[in-house]
């Protein structure tokens, strides 16, 4: 899979989920930028893409290295929240524990909800017993 290196405010103007879908279809799994448009940033997580925010200086350094080295490859360790260059330089990035859990386990909002299926069914059964008029038919 591929990593997309971009400039600031990436995803501006793309308020629909089609933008992350297209990037995923093209083979990207992570996007690195100094900043992202808010809606795009959140849509990335909802669609299994990892948006990584680095400083402009860090992104500039990566662009220079990519331009100077054909076949340049970055390595991302989501569990450790690190990005490593071929020379061994490591950058850390922030991600909430919830979003990291979802990405590491391949969970979208439906998958996350289904992890609690037993609890949901138990609640429904308890409600059915205590308020049967809600369940006519």
UniProtKB/Swiss-Prot annotation:
Keywords tagged on the record: Amino-acid biosynthesis, Branched-chain amino acid biosynthesis, Leucine biosynthesis, Lyase
Keyword Lyase on entry: yes
GO terms classed as biological process: L-leucine biosynthetic process
This protein's pathway: Amino-acid biosynthesis; L-leucine biosynthesis; L-leucine from 3-methyl-2-oxobutanoate: step 2/4
Name by which UniProt lists this protein: 3-isopropylmalate dehydratase small subunit
GO molecular function terms noted in the UniProt entry: 3-isopropylmalate dehydratase activity
Pfam families attached to this UniProt entry: Aconitase_C
Subunit structure: Heterodimer of LeuC and LeuD.
Entry-linked InterPro entries: 3-IsopropMal_deHydase_ssu, Aconitase/3IPM_dehydase_swvl, AconitaseA/IPMdHydase_ssu_swvl, IPMI_Swivel, LeuD
Main function: Catalyzes the isomerization between 2-isopropylmalate and 3-isopropylmalate, via the formation of 2-isopropylmaleate.
Gene3D superfamilies tied to this protein: Aconitase, domain 4 (3.20.19.10)
Native source species: Neisseria lactamica
Catalytic activity: (2R,3S)-3-isopropylmalate = (2S)-2-isopropylmalate
Superkingdom of source: Bacteria
GO CC, any one term: 3-isopropylmalate dehydratase complex
CDD domains in alphabetical order: IPMI_Swivel
Protein family according to the UniProt entry: Belongs to the LeuD family. LeuD type 1 subfamily.
EC identifiers of the protein: 4.2.1.33
């Amino acid at each position: 899979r591929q990593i997309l290196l971009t400039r600031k405010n990436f995803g501006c103007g793309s308020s629909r989920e089609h933008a992350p879908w297209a990037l995923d279809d093209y083979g990207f799994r992570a996007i690195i930028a100094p900043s992202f448009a808010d809606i795009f940033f959140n849509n990335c997580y909802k669609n299994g893409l990892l948006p990584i925010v680095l400083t402009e200086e860090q992104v500039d350094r990566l662009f220079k290295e990519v331009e100077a080295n054909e076949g340049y490859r970055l390595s991302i360790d989501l569990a450790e929240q690190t990005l490593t260059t071929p020379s061994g330089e490591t950058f850390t990035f922030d991600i909430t524990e919830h979003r990291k859990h979802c990405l590491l386990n391949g969970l979208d909002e439906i998958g996350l909800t289904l992890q609690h299926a037993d609890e949901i069914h138990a609640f429904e059964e308890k409600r059915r017993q205590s308020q049967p008029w809600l369940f006519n038919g």
